[in-house]
Amino acid sequence: MNLKVKQKIPLKIKRMGINGEGIGFYQKTLVFVPGALKGEDIYCQITSIRRNFVEAKLLKVNKKSKFRIVPSCTIYNECGGCQIMHLHYDKQLEFKTDLLHQALKKFAPAGYENYEIRPTIGMQEPKYYRAKLQFQTRKFKNQVKAGLYAQNSHYLVELKDCLVQDKETQVIANRLAELLTYHQIPITDERKVLGVRTIMVRRARKTGQVQIIIVTNRQLNLTQLVKELVKDFPEVVTVAVNTNTAKTSEIYGEKTEIIWGQESIQEGVLNYEFSLSPRAFYQLNPEQTEVLYSEAVKALDVDKEDHLIDAYCGVGTIGFAFAKKVKTLRGMDIIPEAIEDAKRNAKRMGFDNTHYEAGTAEEIIPRWYKEGYRADALIVDPPRTGLDDKLLDTILTYVPEKMVYISCNVSTLARDLVRLVEVYDLHYIQSVDMFPHTARTEAVVKLIKKV
């Protein structure tokens, strides 16, 4: 490799990578260029050299893709929260389908060349879709600003009118930053000041209820701030404080205390409502969640005699779509508050065939089997890290008749399929665009036990 940092080179972009970057070859060296699109001829500058590839900065597009558009966001290049807003939305959907093909080719689970990969299901209006806002805070010249860190940095980009963020959550976040400034609430920095680190605002689309978490690494007096905030926004029904003193990139600490209002908000999906406590996980895009869950119901295709396990169940939302269709439903999650929500939700909806426990799937499922419980169907919705090796071992040991894997990371999905297709036939993969203008996608995978 003869390339050097700061060297400027011409490049033909052959494809797009998992983070939305353009990928080309220069003298047989792989080059990654954020902002470049497939089919473009560009001029770029090398920014870093790795063992098997180099990274470069886009300087000029000599031949533009006909699908390149001008992003609507004025700080698109500065923020980094979205990666492919400069690509026409129809082509974004094609790109996300292609990501599945790329991941499968890399990990090569048995028979992947013949998998049915269905076109990605997109949104009618791909904007203002994020019902949950999670912004970092910093103080600049005595003014508190909230936003996201620029990519690969701790430089805060203030966001006051984000095009993918629910409008109401954005308005509340803007006002919260003003109140933090007015009341001179300490804001954490990179050196020695302790105070507010992060603000979270989540809005239930079905009910309009809002909950707020203020993440801090010291005890604060927020009484007057909260009083003014809830006066300005009557839809706020919960304000909580999460204490995180760890010097890590983890946003939340273990302790969350509600300092005003009720324990949870009410949200709805498909034909049922449920409670969400502040720390409980729920999908960020409510509109596409309806699509995702409908696809999961269709793929699992349960019957009334089935016993179903909902791993990574959260507050029970996916499982509730099946509760009236199966004989029994069991779920687990590592967040105890989510399990308590799941129990309350099931009771309120009148389900008497459900059972929930806090803990990991790889620990709980083997115990259930030892106790005599046998699942005919399994649904998994793991984090981006994919399935734990112990859980994979458990699945391969007990092999429920049918399984649906909901993935938010095509790479870990393809990796996990290498083992799963040892015992399952893969019927199809249906991707759903949960995060327009970003390089992320979700996929529903239908698996049936081999005969």
From Swiss-Prot:
The keyword Cytoplasm does not apply. SUPFAM superfamilies: Nucleic acid-binding proteins, S-adenosyl-L-methionine-dependent methyltransferases. The active site is at C408. Its EC number is 2.1.1.-. S-adenosyl-L-methionine binds at Q283, Y312, D333, D381. Keywords: 4Fe-4S, Iron, Iron-sulfur, Metal-binding, Methyltransferase, S-adenosyl-L-methionine, Transferase. InterPro entries: MeTrfase_TrmA_AS, MeTrfase_TrmA_CS, NA-bd_OB-fold, SAM-dependent_MTases_sf, TRAM_dom, U5_MeTrfase_fam. One of its GO terms (biological process) is rRNA base methylation. One of its GO terms (molecular function) is metal ion binding. Pfam families: TRAM, tRNA_U5-meth_tr. [4Fe-4S] cluster binds at C73, C79, C82, C162. Residues 2-60 form the TRAM domain. Belongs to the class I-like SAM-binding methyltransferase superfamily. RNA M5U methyltransferase family. This is Uncharacterized RNA methyltransferase spr1717. The lineage of its organism: Bacteria, Bacillati, Bacillota, Bacilli, Lactobacillales.
